Amino acid sequence: MKLEIALLLLAVTVCVKGGFLQGRSGYDCRRRCGYDRRYVCSTDGTTYDNECMMKCNWAYKSCDGRCPCYRSPAPVVYRPKPAVVYKPRPVVNYEPASVNYEPASVNYEPAAVDYPSVPDYEPIPVYNEPAPVYYDVPVQSDCVCSKDKDYVCTYDGETYDNECEANCDGKAKMCDGQCPCSK
């Protein structure tokens, strides 16, 4: 009787072990997790049918949906441009004939020395163009892009064949079409 029970337990163990060995965790993930299709992408670039299947295979979630994952690029943030700076051009003329070396007259006529040829009191624009600040770069674990020619221009002025190729290089799209972007 004890031998029959031991053989029965051994047979049940073999059947259970043999029928469930499919996932990395040692279980039949399909039986355990079901067939619902809520796709998730793992950090290793594999698309799983649902989160349970992913966890059953000891993988970690990267995003919802099919692979590859794309994070939408954060908006480009610019620092404000400084105001236009006015630089008047005072000119002091000295008359070398005087002995005491004091200025004989002060003349506010435009001088042609050390200044660009801009009329007096015209604004001389001074801009400090900052580089774009990217907070988030698109994530590409496995770059497989189509050969479509939907040109995009990135913030660094490069034209790519399509947005997927730009994202593979970690570049954010500034506008559709070839560079330079028309405003």
Swiss-Prot record:
Keywords: Repeat, Secreted, Signal
GO annotation, cellular component aspect: extracellular region
Domain Kazal-like positions: 23-69, 137-181
SMART domains registered for this protein in UniProt: KAZAL
Stored InterPro entries: Kazal_dom (IPR002350), Kazal_dom_sf (IPR036058)
Tissue/organ expression: Component of the acid-insoluble organic matrix of the calcified shell.
UniProt superkingdom: Eukaryota
Signal peptide: 1-18
Coiled-coil portions: none
Record's subcellular location: Secreted
Protein name as it appears in the record: Insoluble matrix shell protein 6
Species name: Ruditapes philippinarum (Japanese carpet shell)
The organism's taxonomic lineage, starting at the top: Eukaryota, Metazoa, Spiralia, Lophotrochozoa, Mollusca
